[in-house]
C-alpha cells in the first residue's frame, strides 16, 4: 500500500453517485486499478459484509463475496425473503440490529426509499447494490472501464441507447460528475427520470460535462467513443411485449454503430439478450469490452468497500 492511498470519502454510505465528488470518484478508480493488480491485499481482515438480496443476481453477489474474500473479510448472504424484514420487521429495526453484528451492508432491492432508510438508521456503511432508481456500483465499474481504455473523461462521448432505467440514471450522474459528454436516446415515454436529469444537468454546469436526452439513436451515437445499452425489460417488467416493437429501432447493430467513431467500444452491464437490445455480432465482436467491464465490478467495489470501512475506523 505504499504507492496508492485509500481514498478518503466524505460519506458513510454509497446510495447514489451524487454523494461523491469528482476527486473522490477519480481516487476510487485509481485505487480500484491498484487493487486489480494486487488482488490479495488483506485490507479488510476479519470484516463482515452483509449482502441483502431481494432481486436475483449473478455479478453483484459473486463480485461482492469474492471481493470480501480477497480483502481478507467475509461476505454473508442474506435473502430478503428469509429475513424477518420480509415478514414485517421494520427497515429501521433491521438496520439497528445488523449494525450490532456486522461491519457493512450491501443491499439489492426494489425501493430506493428502503435503502435510504436502512442507511439512515444504521451505524455501519450501506452500499446500494441496485434499486429501481439507481445502480451506482455498476456506474463506478463503467467509469473505471472507460478510464482504463482512454485514461481520461475529458472530450470523451458516451452514448446510451435504450431504456432510461436505473443504469442510465447512474451513468448520467457519473458522466456529469467526471465532466464527460453523455447522450441518451430512448423511445418517447421511456426517458430517464426528469429529476435525475435535472440533477445531472446541474452537476454538468460545474464540471463542464455535456448531457443530452434525445429520441434519435443515430444522433446519439454520432462520433461516440463508447456505446452502451441495457436490456429492454428490467426485472419485473417481463411480459410487456409491446416494448419489443417500440424499442426495435434502438437495437445496437452494425448499421447503428456506423455513426460512431471507428474506434468505438461497446459496453453492456449484463445480462444481455442477444438479438434484442444488441446483436451477437456486436456484443461478441472485437470492439466489445463487456466482460472486462463485468470484471471491473469486482475491483471498483473492492475499492469502495475499503474506503467506506476505513472511514468508519478513522472518521475525519
UniProtKB/Swiss-Prot annotation:
A Pfam short name: OTCace
Similarity comment: Belongs to the aspartate/ornithine carbamoyltransferase superfamily. OTCase family.
Subcellular location: Cytoplasm
Pathway terms, separated by semicolons: Amino-acid biosynthesis; L-arginine biosynthesis; L-arginine from L-ornithine and carbamoyl phosphate: step 1/3
Lineage summary: Bacteria, Bacillati, Bacillota, Bacilli, Bacillales
Gene, per the UniProt record: argF
Main location: cytoplasm
GO terms of biological process kind: arginine biosynthetic process via ornithine; citrulline biosynthetic process; L-arginine biosynthetic process
Provenance organism: Bacillus cereus (strain ZK / E33L)
Gene3D superfamilies, per database record: Aspartate/ornithine carbamoyltransferase (3.40.50.1370)
Name recorded for this polypeptide: Ornithine carbamoyltransferase
